[in-house]
Amino acid sequence: MISPVHQVLREGTRDRHETLDHGLALADGDVDRGNYLAYLRALLGWLEPLEERLWQLDWPRELRAPERAGKTTWLYEDLQAAGDTAPIVHCAHPPQVAAPNAYALGVAYVVEGSQLGGRFLAKRLQSTAPELPQRYLRGYEEEVGPLWKAFLLYLDSEAGARDREAQALQGARDAFDSLTGWLRSQGALRA
């Protein structure tokens, strides 16, 4: 059963999510090494400055923030495994998260939800390009389900119980818009 706040975020970002998904060549299995590495570099350029702030906020223990804070490490591992030494350009304007509030949870919804999408892409790439490093796409691996459920429970208890669904939705929309714009500006998203 989907939680009320999750439903608000899912419905309120559906068009943005679809735009992002349809723009990714990876989703079609249309992948070559150069495009894949460019995608990883662009994603890292967006995620690193955001992750540095997002998971350093004063979140309660039940959100398990320290376990969520290593996604940029996985991207660096993939680039290193591929022998990629191209410079990383960082997004100058990722979503601004300043407090552990509903807005930041909306941003985190996009970051954490990408772990579900990454697993889908990893399965697809295993059959079309198994030689490409996929640590980031594998994400939390067997912990993806428990971590996602814990995130949704916290999201619902914080944003839903305090009638802050609109703030969470704005954070999620800003994250999708920022990520899509950044990937497009870096040539990592189809037009």
Task: List the predicted regions and their residue ranges.
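Metal- and O2-centered redox machinery and metal/ROS homeostasis
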Residues: 1-191
